[in-house]
């Protein structure tokens, strides 16, 4: 009988030790599921949620890159707008009949500097090596966890359009030339504004997309956490309980061994 009790007691001690080990592992890792043996189905589900979280986070980074692209383009377009506004101011001045040829020549010299700067900005505006204002380009932004979650971004060749509108042909050296330049400048400004509005709309859309992706990431992380994360209060209580059982078992085993020694 004593042998049976001793065996049962040893089993209790070993089981308590194993449960203490499991609790320690969960407390140290913060996870309820540390291997498939803990909960095979739960591990599969939590892994699926983790994969989605990573995908949402990367998609948000992709969308933020798109926002940076849109902001870069808008900054360049803003500078072009400022140059056109100054160019229009000079053109209005040159169109005034009170100026002489020398006055208009000075205004024309500054105007040529402005058109050169507009050309330079439209030629060099780029993001990560991709031309934004001097090429017709189609870009796909991957902004979701699945293959079809893309936003298409098109960039127009603004530089070419400005050339077609006569940017390099502006001549303020005569009153008639200045008057003719006004319509060309206004059409060019309208084209710049169209592109600014498109990049502004893209910026707003991507900002909303990032917000949605971040919320989706949070929701999936919470779902994963409910399945895979350890309940610290529960694990500590379980650890204390099993520690008491183990120590009680050891005490009983020690007493049993002492009685056996006395009998002998």
Please provide the spans of the model-predicted regions:
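Primary detection of the long, small/polar-rich alpha-helical "axial" segments characteristic
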Residues: 1-264
